[in-house]
Each structure stands twice: as C-alpha cells, then as structure tokens.
Amino acid sequence: HIGAYQVDTNNGKITFLDTPGHAAFSSMRARGAQITDIVVLIVAADDGVMPQTEEAIEHALSAKVPIIVAINKIDKENADVDKILTELSKKNVLTEEWGGDTICIRVSAVTGEGIDQLLEAISLQSEILELKASAKGSAIGTVVESSLDKGKGPIATVLIESGILNKKDYVLVGKEFGRVRAMFNEFNNEINLAGPSVPVVITGLSGTPNVADKLISTNDERKVKEIASLRESKQKEIEMQSKQKTFSIDNFNSDSAASKKIINLIIKSDVQGSSEAIVSSLKAIKNDDVGLDIIYSGV
C-alpha cells in the first residue's frame, strides 16, 4: 500500500508518500514520483543500488523531481557508502561531495542517526524550490489508494494539492462522484476539512475510484453527477473497443492458440494498488501451454 502521512518538524509539517519497494509495484512508484515535490531515494548501505533503485531514479528524472539520497543502515559493519556513491554516479545522480547538486544524507533507522539532518535537508530543498499552494477555493487532489470497507463503503485516500476540502462537499473523482460523508486523517481521527499537502481518507463516494484519479470539489451536485455519467460511458466505450481489439488478435492467432489452455481469473484485493500490482505480475508470466484471461480486477 502507499502510506501517506505527515511529520511535524521544527520547520513545519512534511507530508510523506511511502511506496512499496517490491518490483511488482512499479506503477505505484511511478505515480508517487508524479505527485510529489521531492523524491527521497533510500538506498541500503549494505545492499547498494538495486534494480528498484534504478527504476525509482528513472521515475524521478522523468518527472523532473529533485532527488535527496538517504543512505540507510550506516550502523552496519558492512556499510559501503563509497560504493553506493559510485553506483549512483553511473545513473546520473551526482551527490554534492562528488561535485554534483544532489543532497546525500547518511542515516540509520535503528539508531536515529541523520534523521534530523534529513528532515532539515527536505525543508531546505522546499524553500529553494519555493513550494507553495493555494489554501483557497475548491479542492483539487489525487487518489493515492482506494478500497471497499464493509462498514463505510467505498473509501479513497486522497492527497489534497490545492484548495480546501470540507465535509459535505460534493466531489468528482474520476468516474465516481458523491458527497463527503466523513473524512479521516492518517491516525483515523475524523476531521472536518483538509488543505494542501494533507493526506485524507474520504467516504461517501458512488464507487471505488482508480488510483491516480483526480478529485475536484464543488457545490454543484447536478454537474458532478452529469460529468461522472459521461466519464463512465466513455470508459465503457474504451473497454469495449479494447475487448474487440483483443478478440481480433486472438482470432488471428487462433491456429497456434487452439491447443492452449486458458485460465480465467478474477482478481480481488484489499486495495486498488495491490490489485494493479498482481495483474501486472500475472501479465508478465509467459507460457506456451497456458494463458491467462483476467475477467475482472479490483477491490
């Protein structure tokens, strides 16, 4: 899951989006780079630059988001910082001590060493970038996770990027819509409003939105329902065209696929992000004798 939470520092609050490091969650890390202001690239001092590290660097560079390197586990005896700096330089990440402009902080999650310096570096970078957002007007945000709760119904974790989201606001989220019935912070405490950079869980939606869907708040219920209906119709049209295209390709390959066994799958997970990762991993599996047909995936 993407973890979204805030940390109080001497220089104000910092919002963190914590994405999984496993290879299956590539799309989740890519989205994280798209909606964040600064990427904190954590590299284990005893492991060095891993394939997922290289991928995270590519996401950050592609999104043109500044990187702060945090070398973790420096308390370990086999920590090799010089090796990491060399590997990073080969990936176009030059730290300040190597003549580049990328901040590099040595930290230990076990002892707490370097954590204060890391928070200070993030605050300094945000000042240099002059990161600001309007706390007025309708809320605009991005869905970082969504799920279906037995008691609360469809819920979505949203990072507010500008404006103010209030309880009872009407919202349009992708093809879903609704009126905010309740809002909760990362500690599951109910709140009445959320401003820029605040991660918030909302209830009251018509369905579970897709991860990365944009949220827009308004006081016009009719307009929200109208746009949501148009978006749903458009999505169904796209899905139908995709199925027709797949059917045509399958017919073209019918001779070679005639003896191939097809396993139909329905993927249901706790949150949208996990479902997406499972589908991505399954599609990467290639087999000459058995094929997969994912009929449905979601929460």
Where are the language model's segments positioned?
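Switch/connector loops and helix/strand junctions flanking conserved nucleotide-binding motifs
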Residues: 50-51, 76-83, 113-117, 180-181, ...
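Switch I (G2) and immediately adjacent beta-strands of P-loop GTPase domains
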Residues: 1-38, 45, 58-61, 146, ...
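Canonical P-loop GTPase G-domain recognition
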Residues: 66, 75-136, 201, 291-298
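Short, ordered loop/turn segments at secondary-structure junctions
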Residues: 19-22, 33, 44-48, 65, ...
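Residue-level signature of catalytic and energy-coupling elements of molecular machines
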Residues: 16-18, 40, 53, 60, ...
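Conserved Switch II/interswitch segment of TRAFAC-class P-loop GTPases
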Residues: 13, 23, 34-54, 61-82, ...
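Active-site phosphate-binding and catalytic loops of NTP-dependent enzymes
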Residues: 12, 25, 50, 90-100, ...
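C-terminal effector/interaction modules appended to NTPase cores
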Residues: 62, 150-299
